[in-house]
């Protein structure tokens, strides 16, 4: 079994993380499934409201007690949704900002 410092930091068994894809591509059940098998599940929160972030976090916690992350795209972040994520206190909050020069053309 591969064990890295990231495993200890995130409280996971394997150094495998689910990408927090927004737009509804990651759902609470998928996040919980990855976390349950020892990886680090992440929920894409881009475009979500504060109440949606809170509800999704509750749905994940209803399925699993394992650690997970909430993921935000900074260029379209909703401050209330981000505040709701902070209040949920997930093990991780992931932030991203895309660069146009890295797009596949």
Regions found by a protein language model. Give the residues of each.
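Active-site entrance/lid segments in N-terminal catalytic domains of soluble metabolic enzymes
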Residues: 1-105
């Amino acid at each position: 079994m591969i064990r890295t410092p990231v495993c200890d930091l995130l409280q996971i068994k394997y150094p495998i993380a689910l990408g927090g894809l927004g737009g509804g591509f990651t759902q609470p059940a998928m996040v919980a499934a990855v976390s349950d098998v020892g990886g680090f599940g992440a929920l894409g929160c881009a475009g979500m409201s504060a109440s949606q972030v809170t509800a999704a976090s509750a749905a994940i916690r209803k399925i699993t007690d394992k650690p997970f992350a909430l993921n935000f795209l900074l260029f379209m972040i909703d401050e209330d949704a981000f505040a709701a994520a902070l209040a949920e206190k997930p093990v991780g909050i992931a932030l991203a900002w895309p660069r146009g020069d890295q797009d596949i053309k």
